[in-house]
Amino acid sequence: MVRLLISTGEVSGDLQGSLLIQALQREVERRSLPLELMALGGPRMQASGAELLADTAPMGAIGLWEALPLVLPTLRLQSRVDHVLKQRPPDAVVLIDYMGANVRLGHKLRRWFPRVPIIYYIAPQEWAWRFGDGGTTQLLSFTDRILAIFPVEAEFYSQRGAKVTWVGHPLLDTVSVLPDRQQARERLGLKPGQRLLLLLPASRQQELRYLMPTLAKAAALLQQRDQSLEVIVPAGLASFEKSLQEALEAAAVRGRVLSAQQADELKPMLYAAADLALGKSGTVNMEMALRGVPQVVGYKVSRITAFVARHFLRFRVEHISPVNLLLKERLVPELLQDELTAEALVQAAIPLLEDPAQRNEMLEGYRRLRQTLGVPGVTDRAAKEILDLTKT
């Protein structure tokens, strides 16, 4: 029997965790090895077969101010999880993204279980930040292996003394052939010639507050220009659905919110039919790129967090979208903090909706990006590495 603990948070982490769990189950079946999976994650990981010790999908936050409301719930959650892990020690630990919480957990588990391997899959993107190497040193102090998803990430951590395996980007495993565009449009109820705009605002509650009103206002302005423009907002979590609908209504947007379940079921249809996406920075940018959906990216945090990051942490980053970070160019339009207005979003969106040359330039950049991400079979390679490192 192998007992694994997988820890992640937020909607994107829950998705990546579920894909890894499915790959682990395939690998243990091949090895005829009984497997027990405990998880800090979300409903997708639970549906894939993990025992959910705590639902961390709604608990992500960026910034000191934004994280304050989560302090007490996080402490209560940690107390429950600590009790379970002391009663049922894991044979290996897999940390997925979710930097702050996973770094704290990694330090704790290294003290408690010095011989248990700790594997970081989808490590913090410190290669893209200008914080110095303090966080990297912390991470390496408890990590036995890093499974890198980007070549630049593998090089960064390897140069600093980590044992690293580059497995490729896990979204490659989800990019099958899209449905026929015309069939997808018919399934979604789109009329001939009608454009589809996706709004992708949030994997965290704070992002709904800071991003969705602006995205909705931009959608309303675009509908004034093109009255037939259809707007769809897929919800990342069921708890987001009401807030998303209220934001559309407040901006007088003619559109629909898909429930989290509908969004999962219709995702391939949405990507095949979409003409443009307006959304946050993060994993969703890579998903749009791999699916060939032109996009405009925005991000905003509280003024307090922005001030602290700029003046005290000396936070500097060339780009906020992973697409641009990896290509080292501004392929995807980005709007950050005060730049992020409805009018600026519209100005960036119009060429992508109306100028075929602009669209084709972005799609060509997507093709170049994909060539840097490895080959499919990513989660299977990660699962094999994890089980090879596990003490049985």
UniProtKB/Swiss-Prot annotation:
The similarity comment for this entry is: Belongs to the LpxB family.
Q: Please provide the record's keywords in A-Z order.
A: Glycosyltransferase, Lipid A biosynthesis, Lipid biosynthesis, Lipid metabolism, Transferase
Task: Please report a single Pfam family linked to this protein.
Answer: LpxB
**Assigned GO CC terms:** membrane
* Pathway recorded for this protein: Bacterial outer membrane biogenesis; LPS lipid A biosynthesis
**SUPFAM superfamilies assigned:** UDP-Glycosyltransferase/glycogen phosphorylase (SSF53756)
What is this protein identified as? Answer: Lipid-A-disaccharide synthase
**Could you give a GO molecular-function term held by this entry?**
lipid-A-disaccharide synthase activity
Q: Which organism is it from?
A: Prochlorococcus marinus (strain MIT 9313)
Q: If you read the UniProt record, what top EC class would you report for this enzyme, in one word?
A: transferase
